[in-house]
Structure formats: structure tokens, C-alpha cells
């Protein structure tokens, strides 16, 4: 596969102060972009695992995840294809809750997120801690649709949205960086929208 500048978005005037460079406000729309076939997942058969460099590798069922302390996120999301969306109310569990439950080892520095489809994306561990990331299953008070990653997706809103893996099922903590799907194909390893880190070398 080769990486192109595809999925070109449309730009609009009146940019807001909280809009990163090169982005446009999508408004009421919410584009659906994916690198794979959208799966049909039964929430009762879905599980969430956190493993790797942790003291107690743990797998939660759908019901067990919902029994954990929940929290919300209200704020923008930014897609690498140049659209941003404001005003979605997300609900789920902070990744901090999961990390506290498993016990993170001192040597853990990176995370590889894996979806039920086999899609992967890599993140520095520090970008999942401190109230920066969630495992989310609701958007605007409704179950997250499968097109947008439901029943559950990773939500890392301060990075480009390909880092918020749809249909997430596993977080593996590592002492070294392992590139995910898009990163192996030329996308940036971090993906900070305020620094326009879209592609390797940006």
C-alpha cells in the first residue's frame, strides 16, 4: 500500500480559535472513514484486555466494563483527512481506570491498541494517562454506532482520530514502539494535530 493525500476535505471560512492548523469544522456532519470492512459485533461477546508489561493482565466483559467508574469527554475530535468535529458528548471509562486496575510496570513506555478486526495503532503510554483517553461506548447519549467504532472504541481526542481505534479489544503495554497499521504505511507515529503530524517526517 502507498500513502496518498486522499480523503480530501472541504475548507470553510470563519475558522475558530480551537481549530488546529489545516483543519475545517465539519459542523453537523460526522464522516465515516475506515481502512477495513465494518464488523457486526455483539456487545455481549466483546471483551477488553489490557496486557503486556502489567502486573495483572486483565480481560473485562461488556458488563464488567460498565460496572467500572465511568466518565465523560466533551470536546473536539480531529481527523487526519482535515475535518474536525465539535460538540460530541462521549461516555465510557477512562483508560486511567484500566491502567490502575492492572498495575503498570516501570518499563512500560508504549501501547499497541488492537481492534477486533486486527487493526492496530501505536501510542506513547504518556498520551493515554492523566485523563487524556477513554474506552468509549456512547456518543451524545446513544450507543456508539458500529460505523463509528461501536460497540466500543478507543478515544484519544488530542491526537488525530486514526489513533482512536474503532472496535478496540486490547491494549498491550510495551517497552518499545511497535508501529500500527497506518504508521507502517507512512502516517506519523504520534499524530499531534496542533503540529500537523500527519505523515512520517512532519
Question: Where is each model-derived feature located?
Answer:
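Structured, non-membrane catalytic/scaffold regions adjacent to prosthetic-group chemistry
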Residues: 2-202
Amino acid at each position: 500500500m502507498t500513502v496518498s493525500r486522499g480523503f480530501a476535505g472541504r475548507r470553510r471560512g470563519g475558522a475558530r480559535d480551537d481549530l488546529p492548523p489545516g483543519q475545517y469544522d465539519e459542523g453537523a456532519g460526522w464522516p465515516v472513514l475506515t481502512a477495513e470492512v465494518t464488523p457486526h459485533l455483539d456487545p455481549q461477546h466483546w471483551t477488553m484486555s489490557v496486557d503486556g508489561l502489567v502486573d495483572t493482565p486483565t480481560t473485562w466483559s461488556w458488563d464488567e466494563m460498565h460496572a467500572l467508574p465511568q466518565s465523560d469527554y466533551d470536546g473536539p475530535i480531529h481527523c487526519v483527512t482535515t475535518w474536525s468535529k465539535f460538540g460530541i458528548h462521549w461516555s465510557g471509562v477512562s483508560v486511567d481506570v484500566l491502567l490502575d486496575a492492572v498495575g503498570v510496570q516501570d518499563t512500560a513506555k508504549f501501547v499497541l491498541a488492537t481492534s477486533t478486526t486486527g487493526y492496530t495503532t501505536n501510542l506513547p503510554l504518556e498520551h493515554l494517562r492523566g485523563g487524556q483517553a477513554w474506552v468509549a461506548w456512547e456518543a451524545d447519549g446513544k450507543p456508539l454506532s458500529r460505523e463509528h467504532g461501536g460497540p466500543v472504541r478507543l478515544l484519544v481526542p488530542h491526537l488525530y482520530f486514526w489513533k482512536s481505534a474503532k472496535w478496540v479489544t486490547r491494549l498491550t503495554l510495551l517497552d518499545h514502539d511497535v508501529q500500527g497499521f497506518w504508521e507502517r504505511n507512512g502516517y506519523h507515529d504520534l499524530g499531534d494535530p496542533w503540529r500537523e503530524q500527519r505523515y512520517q517526517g512532519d
